[in-house]
A protein has these predicted regions:
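N-terminal active-site segment of His-dependent metallophosphoesterases
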Residues: 1-70
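Structural beta-strand/beta-sheet cores of well-ordered domains, especially the beta-sheet scaffolds
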Residues: 8, 162, 203, 218, ...
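Flexible, active-site-adjacent loop/turn segments at secondary-structure boundaries
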Residues: 8-10, 14, 190, 195, ...
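A structural signal for the main folded, soluble domain(s) of proteins
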Residues: 31-32, 37, 146-152, 252-257, ...
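His/Asp/Glu-rich metal-coordinating catalytic cores
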Residues: 50, 61-221, 228-230
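Binuclear metal-dependent phosphoesterase catalytic core
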Residues: 123-126, 223-278
Length: 278
């Protein structure tokens, strides 16, 4: 049985432009980095064999060098394979962070366990087959998973679980229901049609872009952000976790959220009986 951690939307370098207090912005940014250490702790605690990042590891395609070095050092400390696809914030177009010589040099030095998946083709691991569906531009009206419809599944090892790793919205959710990224909403772009995928050939669909915990189907999940990034908007708003996933070929995945968030965002309401109360 394969045991992995499904994460997404780390968004290292997020500016928190709506937070006026400079010290609070800095604290929020530091907690996003610290959450990577808590992902490592969960991986050790549950003897995970690999970590998935379903897009938006960075908040932009040109993050600050200090943030890049810090997160690479934290990823290197995980000491497990960390498989990453570009999302809409850190898409994989030429000239972006992933293609820079300095990033690639630092990655080799600090995080040799980071495996960037920018090609839409099967990746064969010892424990699984990963089917990456990276975003290669910020907004794309084509389905990043469309390449899977033409895949010859008979060429894949029959005994290994198959994992789709994708970033984007899912067909079937309206604009009010889709609570992805308020800074870069997906809208009609980057939409994934899960119904077009051959369900019997896929064991787990690891999604990113939705900032809340969300089960889309028996095999498809969004983990939400590992560190909360905004005020709660109701009981359905569950942030600050990763997903522990246990997989076997041909079986339904066993999925359990594991806490990684530290900060709590609270909405406070006051009722005044009269103007004199102020």
């Amino acid at each position: 049985m394969l045991r992995l951690l499904h994460t997404a939307d780390w968004q290292i370098g997020k500016p928190y432009g709506t937070v006026a207090d400079e010290q609070k912005r800095y604290r929020l940014q530091q907690e996003r980095l610290a959450a990577v250490g808590r992902i490592r702790e969960q991986a050790l605690l549950h003897s995970a064999q690999l970590v998935l990042v379903a897009g938006d590891l960075f908040d932009s395609t040109a993050p600050a060098t200090t943030a890049v070095l810090e997160v690479l050092e934290s990823i290197g400390a995980i000491a497990l394979p960390v498989l990453v696809i570009p999302g809409n914030h850190d898409h994989g177009a030429p000239g972006t962070i992933w293609h820079r010589d300095d990033f690639q040099r630092h990655q080799r030095q600090l995080a040799p366990n980071l495996q960037l998946l920018v090609d839409r083709s099967p990746v064969l691991l010892e424990q699984a087959v990963v089917l990456p569906c990276p975003l290669l531009r910020n907004q794309d009206n084509s389905d990043p998973c469309a390449w899977l419809q033409a895949l010859d599944w008979s060429t894949l090892p029959a005994e290994l679980p198959r994992i789709v790793l994708a970033h984007g919205g899912v067909h079937g959710f309206g604009g009010r229901d889709y609570d992805g990224d308020e800074d870069a909403p997906a809208g009609a772009n980057n939409l994934i049609d899960l119904s077009a995928l051959p369900a019997s050939q896929i064991d787990y669909i690891a999604l990113g872009d939705w900032h809340n915990l969300k089960q889309v189907s028996e095999r498809a999940w969004y983990p939400g952000t590992p560190e909360p990034d905004r005020f709660d908007q109701g009981d359905a708003n569950q942030r600050g976790q990763v997903l522990l996933v246990e997989l076997e070929r041909g079986a339904l995945p066993q999925v359990r959220p594991q806490p990684t968030g530290r900060l709590r965002w609270h909405n406070l309401r006051f009722r005044f009986s009269s103007t004199s109360s102020t």
